[in-house]
Amino acid sequence: MSDVVRAEKIAHEVDYAARQLAQMGRLDLTREFIQHGDVTVYAHVTSVARASLSFAERLGRAGISVDRASLLRGALLHDYFLYDWHDPDPSHRLHGFRHPFFALARAEEDFELTPRERNIIARHMFPLVPVPPTCREAWIVCLADKWCALCETVAGRLPRKDGANDLNEGSSDGSSKESSEKRRG
């Protein structure tokens, strides 16, 4: 299978799972909150889910198996904290340290979670939160989250080879072209 076909298959799998979670819970609320730069929480978690599945497939070709369903749901719910952490609300202080526990609490309100899904959500901020993941799936999401956050923050500020100013310009992944234009002045 070509890389393009594999990526399309993963994208469809993530979209389907996200629609299911949106119907059963409040995942669509994450479209309203910005995570990194001008990327919404929804766009971020779907990117993390795609990266996690891609990495899991590479591991699978090396003979290392994962619980794909828990990996996907955990990736989509890892930032299910359901608030705008940019608001000056005192409860949002130390968001980086505390949001995994808020996300886990909200996810447990809306969904029945497996132990692996709980581990993914609670431990994805390692090493900032100093308790490491204890399963492969949580390690995968932890690493995919770091990679996607890097791309969303740093890479969005770097000049592109094609001369465009914004990594997310014209994106359909939940990032806002309008807010990109506001940032540029």
Located regions from the model:
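Metal-dependent phosphohydrolase cores
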Residues: 1-185
